[in-house]
Amino acid sequence: MNYNPNKNEIEFVNNALEKFNNMHVGPDNHLLLNIVEYDENQNVIAGILGGTYWGWLHIDILWVDENFRSKKIGSRILIAAENEAKKRGCHSVHVDTMSWQAPDFYKKHGYELISELDNIPNGYKKFHFI
């Protein structure tokens, strides 16, 4: 057993799973969906990073600079990502967030909590929304 596989071995495992998945459900047609927002000096002040596949948008990261929070920037880029996902044929969104991050933000936007993990890290929670 190797706890530090090289790049080729990692790629082999990824490709093997992709081939297996494709045999069962067809290609995922994964496309990145990344959006950033700038201030007046073209500095990045917010971003959403994710991708679309199998009819879903997965949000990996949604971040807004602390100096620009409570100005609807997060809402604006979330809605922009949702709209782009719909253009790509997506029917749903899923996202994870931590208890100190943005669970209330996603609830405010109509997301439904579907699971919660305790003590990740110790004393905190991880939430999964759709």
Name the predicted role of every residue range.
Residues 34-36, 127:
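Hydrophobic beta-strand residues of extracellular immunoglobulin-like
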Residues 45-46, 115:
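A structural microfeature
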Residues 28, 39-40, 48-57, 62-65:
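A conserved beta-strand-loop-helix scaffold within acyl/acetyltransferase catalytic domains
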Residues 94-96, 112-128:
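Conserved catalytic-core motifs of GNAT/GCN5-like acyltransferases
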Residues 1-11:
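A short beta-loop-alpha structural element at the N-terminal edge
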Residues 70-83, 108:
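Conserved acetyl-CoA-binding loop-helix of GNAT-fold acetyltransferases
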Residues 13, 106-107, 111:
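Conserved active-site tyrosine of GNAT-family acetyltransferases
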Residues 85-98:
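Conserved GNAT acetyl-CoA-binding A-motif
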